[in-house]
Each structure stands twice: as structure tokens, then as C-alpha cells.
From Swiss-Prot:
It comes from the Bacteria. This is Elongation factor 4. It comes from Deinococcus radiodurans (strain ATCC 13939 / DSM 20539 / JCM 16871 / CCUG 27074 / LMG 4051 / NBRC 15346 / NCIMB 9279 / VKM B-1422 / R1). One of its GO terms (cellular component) is plasma membrane. Required for accurate and efficient protein synthesis under certain stress conditions. May act as a fidelity factor of the translation reaction, by catalyzing a one-codon backward translocation of tRNAs on improperly translocated ribosomes. Back-translocation proceeds from a post-translocation (POST) complex to a pre-translocation (PRE) complex, thus giving elongation factor G a second chance to translocate the tRNAs correctly. Binds to ribosomes in a GTP-dependent manner. PANTHER family: TRANSLATION FACTOR GUF1 HOMOLOG, CHLOROPLASTIC, TRANSLATION FACTOR GUF1-RELATED. It is a peripheral membrane protein. NCBIfam families: lepA, small_GTP. GTP binds at D24, H25, G26, K27, S28, T29, N141, K142, I143, D144.
Length: 606
């Protein structure tokens, strides 16, 4: 950490803005050019995607975490301005991160790829910005591409979102064309922040991360008042008081400053030790002079996909719990609670925003915390009434009682609303019908349609979000609310490998789908289970009735096994490689079931 500038900039000279775009429209590259133009990147810092701080982000070429940075800009007439640029993720899974970052800004640069035109996320992001009353500066990016059609892209912007085509700045993040015009547009078009530095403190937490030495570091946008070291502050949602240790700005690292006042974006360290206290979207206020009301409109993100995560080595359970708690701090949209499995031992049931989110969390756990994990099929909480009148709830298919003991089974239903362009209504309605949905209403909003369905929650858990996106080419967006429980004709399908039931692979499914799902699972499992010296039967069963079977054929005997000679170090290397592969597996009786088998259950819809 370094010491930063001490004199507070007048709010009229501050501009807080964000860059939003569809995935792959060149947002991080454009941010790099802006940083370069304003001298925020030294020669040694020059690398692509400067604001993408996670190694995983640069590898996949996507932005996952929102990263802020403070920049200084001087106009030709000598006027100095402070820009706070808050980089946001572009993938649909991370919409929550985008909405929080936008709440900290007064305006946005809306990027559109000149060769692709307006895409789904462009529209979603533009509406997010409009909902937050932000000034939109449209930028047609990648005009240097051979396939670029900047005029067409500008026209689309006007037709779809209603932004006048002549307002769009033409630019190229790669070559740096148009960057000076963008910087001028930020000063001219984006309003300075409002707010009274003398009012009681009111600051919005839009992100946070855990630092081993200072505890939780909060990323805040100060809306009213002033905050400096030694001030008493209160987290309004958590209802807890703390003393500020340090405040500062970003450049892109943390730079210690004297104070943060109305209009500024910065960070606060206040010795907050408990991860759960630092909820993103909470309001920070003075402990003695409190603001009248917290920042409105923040709701915690609702996870869409649920899955169990188990360490392959049971001794890593505590390490996994600590890692999940730390990740939760950096990712408000992720939830988890403990669960157990006979086959896999102790683990956690985790909630994610989508499959990319789930994949990234699992990858981060494995990389950053050096854990080996197995992920199970997603499920919901079922309510079972037994023949003796007893009622209990379970989300673990392994705990499901036998058919003869069940009076009735109830499953959670949701009210699902889907917004989509009218061209895709047919295929989306068909998808909802396949998922046992019943249609409630259908409303036309301009050229878009809102479908409202009542659907069993379990039906949207597997891959519904992804199927919806692919059917609608990414244009459909969904939201849901819980409706409570309803009776359903549900069955538990067990999977047996070599005549042994594997509890972690059990699924609960509607009677109408038992055969097709059982068939898909056993066929997929037979592909991924390694061949043994003997044939291995893989069966799907309901109670004692076998509904589907596949066989993993036996190896023929390896006649080369008795060969001598060969390089010993080569043999060692192969043995070592095999050992690593085995660590990813759990032993069930005599047959090893690899991680792919658990994933096969997840991807049966493909």
C-alpha cells in the first residue's frame, strides 16, 4: 500500500462511471487503453486485461470480479478531473455484480461491437443502467475490424434501446482510436456526483474482499458525508459498529488516503473480522450521526443452480469450509450449507448463479485453496408425508424413504417469469411445457413478451437457464419467486454399479420421466466408468424394479504385462500420473467411479 493524494477533489470535478458490454465486445481492452492514455500503467504493468485481477479471468478472457481504479484526467484547457472507473463483469451469470457496481456510478460507457451489433447482454445492461438513472454514453468499439459496420451498429442502438445514433462515439480498444473523444464525452455527458460532505455519512458497499492482515476490506461509494481513519462507523444491515482503520482509493492497487467524502469511490479497512457482517449492498453510516435510511433497492442475488461439493480427502472438510467462507465474502451471490453423504462423507450444498459460476467457484477452490473436490447432481428440498402421518423434509435423495412408507411427496413450485423477444415465444413455451410448467399469463411489452409460468423448482435446476439462453440466442432473461409446496408423483431413481447402490448418484424425478432419465444416466455412466477385468453392470432402479441397464465390457487380458526392459524413469512417471488420476476418484466396492460419472448425471439433457 502506498500513500495517496491528500487534498479532496471538489465533487464537480469527479466522474464515476462504469463500462458495460456483452461478453467479448472488448471491454477490458478498452479499459486498458483508457488507463494507458491517462498514464495509469507503467511500462512494467503493461499486460492485457489490467483490471482482470484473477488469473482465471485472464485465462478465460472474461471479467468475473468488479475492479475499481482512480484516474486523473487533464483537459486541454488545464482543468483537472478525477475519474473513478469501475470495471464490471459481462457474463449473464454475474449480473448481480454489474447491478451493484452500477449503483456506485452516475454514468456508463455502453460498448457495442461494430462487427456484432447490439446483443442480448447489451440490452440487459442498458436497461440496468436506465433503471439506475445513469447517463449512457454509447461507444461503437472495434471499428478497426474488417467486418466492422459502425453505422449499422449505431442504427441498431437507436432502434432497440432508443439511444440517438449520432451520440455514439466510434472507437477501437485495440488501436486506441477514439479514446480522447471518449474521455471528453465522460466529462461532458456524465454528471458529477451529488451529495453533501457535511451530511451524516452514507456509503454503499459494492464489493469486498478478505485481507489476512486487515480483515474485510470494503469497496464503497460515498453518497453523503465524509469518512476518515479513527471514525466510528455502523453497518446498517448487520447492525454492528466498527472503527475505521484506514481509507483510500484504487490505483489499481490500494492507495492509502486521508479521507473519503461525498462523491468519492474508495476502500475502507475497519478491522471487520466476520465475513458475514460485510454484506454487499449494505449501507455504511456514522455510529454517532446516522443517516435516516439505508441505500434502497438492494436484494441479495438468488442462486439458480444448487450442487453438493465434497472434498475427496475427508480431512480437507474444515479447509473447504474456510475456503467457502472466504469465497462467499468476495462473491455475495454464492451460498452454502453443510450436508453429508454415505458415499462421499461430509461436504456442502452450494447455490450458484449459473453453470459458469458453479464451474468457476469449483475451479477457484481447487486452484487457490488446493482442494480436490467432487460435485454432485443438483436437487431441491422435498416434503415427504409418511404412512404413519409423520412429515419430514429432505434434499438428499439418499434419505428418501421407500415407496411403501410414503403417503405423499410434495415439491417446491416457483412462479417463473421469462422476458424474451416475440420471435422465440414458441420454442420457449415448448421448453416450459417439457419442464411440467403451467402457463399463467402472457403479456406483450413492445416487441418483447413476458411469459409467467408455474413450474416445479427441480425442473429449472439442472440446465434450464442454459437451455433457455441457447433457445433464445441469449435474449431471454428469467426471474422466479417461491410459491410453496404442491403434491407431485415423484420417484427416487437409484443407480447401482456392480450391484452396489451409490447414494451420491440417486436422483428424484417425476414419474413421467423416470425411464428416459434412467436410460440416459446408465448409458452415460457406462461410457465414463473405466473398464475392469470383469464386466460391470450399471443399473437404474426404482425400489427393487430395474428400469434400465448398461454394461461396461471387460478388458481382454493384457499379454504385454509380463514384458521386461524399458526405461525405469518412464515407468515411474506413468505410475505417478496414474496415482494423480486416482486421487480424483472415490472407491466404491470393487469399481472406481470417476468424477466424470457425477458430471454425467448433471448433463443428461445434452
Amino acid at each position: 500500500m502506498t500513500a495517496g493524494p491528500t487534498d479532496p477533489t471538489p465533487t464537480s470535478q469527479i466522474r464515476n462511471f462504469s463500462i458495460i458490454a456483452h461478453v467479448d465486445h472488448g471491454k477490458s481492452t478498452l479499459a486498458d487503453r483508457i488507463l494507458e492514455q491517462l498514464g495509469a500503467m507503467g511500462e512494467r504493468d503493461k499486460r492485457d486485461q489490467t483490471l482482470d485481477t484473477l488469473e482465471l479471468e485472464r485465462e478465460r478472457g472474461i471479467t468475473i470480479k468488479s475492479t475499481p481504479i482512480r484516474l486523473e484526467y487533464t483537459r486541454e484547457n488545464g482543468e483537472g478531473y478525477v475519474f473513478n472507473l469501475i470495471d464490471t463483469p459481462g457474463h449473464v451469470d454475474f449480473n448481480y455484480e454489474v447491478s451493484r457496481s452500477l449503483a456506485a456510478c452516475e454514468g456508463v460507457l455502453l460498448l457495442v461491437d461494430a462487427s456484432q451489433g447490439v446483443e442480448a447482454q447489451t440490452i440487459v445492461n442498458a436497461y440496468l443502467a436506465i433503471d439506475n438513472n445513469l447517463e449512457i454514453v454509447p461507444v461503437i468499439n472495434k471499428i478497426d475490424l474488417p467486418a466492422a459496420d459502425p453505422e449499422g451498429a449505431a442504427r441498431e442502438l437507436e432502434e432497440v434501446i432508443g439511444i440517438p445514433a449520432e451520440d455514439a462515439v466510434r472507437a477501437s480498444g485495440k488501436t486506441g482510436i477514439g479514446i480522447p473523444e471518449i474521455l471528453e464525452a465522460v466529462v461532458e455527458r456524465i454528471p458529477p456526483p451529488a451529495g453533501d460532505p457535511g451530511a451524516p455519512l452514507k456509503a454503499l458497499i459494492f464489493d469486498s474482499f478478505f485481507d489476512a492482515y486487515q480483515g474485510v476490506i470494503l469497496f464503497v461509494r460515498v453518497l453523503e458525508g465524509t469518512m476518515k481513519a479513527k471514525d466510528g462507523v455502523r453497518l446498517m444491515n448487520a447492525g454492528k459498529n466498527f472503527e475505521v482503520d484506514k481509507v483510500g482509493t484504487f490505483s489499481p492497487g490500494l492507495v492509502v488516503g486521508q479521507e473519503l467524502s461525498a462523491g468519492m469511490v474508495g476502500w475502507v479497512a475497519a478491522g471487520i473480522k466476520d465475513i458475514q457482517d460485510a454484506q454487499v449492498g449494505d449501507t455504511l453510516t456514522g455510529s454517532d450521526r446516522q443517516t435516516a435510511e439505508p441505500f434502497p433497492g438492494f436484494k441479495p442475488a438468488q442462486p439458480v443452480v444448487f450442487s453438493g461439493l465434497y472434498p475427496t480427502d475427508t480431512e480437507d472438510y474444515r479447509k473447504l469450509r474456510d475456503a467457502l467462507e472466504k469465497l462467499k465474502l468476495n462473491d455475495a451471490a454464492f451460498s452454502f450449507e453443510p450436508e453429508t453423504s454415505e458415499a462421499l462423507g461430509f461436504g456442502f450444498r452450494c447455490g450458484f448463479l449459473g453453470l459458469l459460476h458453479a464451474e468457476i467457484i469449483q475451479e477457484r477452490l481447487e486452484r487457490e485453496y488446493d482442494l480436490d473436490l467432487i460435485a454432485t447432481a443438483p436437487a431441491v428440498v422435498y416434503r415427504v408425508t409418511l404412512t404413519n402421518g409423520e412429515i419430514f423434509e429432505t434434499q438428499n435423495p439418499a434419505e428418501f424413504p421407500t415407496r411403501d412408507r410414503i403417503e405423499k411427496v410434495e415439491e417446491p413450485y416457483i412462479k417463473l417469469s421469462v422476458m424474451l423477444p416475440e420471435d422465440y415465444v414458441g420454442p420457449v413455451m415448448q421448453l416450459l411445457q417439457e419442464r411440467r410448467g403451467s402457463m399463467q399469463t402472457m403479456n406483450y411489452v413492445g416487441k418483447r413478451v413476458e411469459l409467467v409460468y408455474e413450474v416445479p423448482f427441480a425442473e429449472i435446476l439442472y440446465d434450464f437457464h442454459d437451455r433457455l439462453k441457447s433457445i433464445s440466442r441469449g435474449y431471454a432473461s428469467m426471474d422466479y419467486e417461491q410459491l410453496g409446496y404442491r403434491e407431485g408423483d415423484l420417484r427416487k431413481v437409484d443407480i447401482m454399479v456392480n450391484n452396489e447402490v451409490i447414494d451420491a448418484l440417486a436422483v428424484i424425478v417425476h414419474e413421467s420421466k423416470t425411464y428416459s432419465l434412467g436410460r440416459k444416466i446408465v448409458d452415460k455412466m457406462a461410457e465414463v466408468i473405466p473398464r475392469q477385468m470383469f464386466p460391470v453392470p450399471v443399473q437404474a432402479v426404482i425400489g427393487a424394479k430395474i428400469i434400465a441397464r448398461a454394461t461396461v465390457k471387460a478388458y481382454r487380458k493384457d499379454v504385454l504385462a509380463k514384458c521386461y526392459g524399458g526405461d525405469i524413469s518412464r515407468k515411474k512417471k506413468l505410475l505417478e500420473k496414474q496415482k494423480k488420476g486416482r486421487a480424483r476418484m472415490k472407491q466404491f466396492g470393487t469399481v472406481e467411479v470417476p468424477q466424470e460419472a457425477f458430471l454425467a448425471v448433471l448433463s443428461t439433457e445434452e
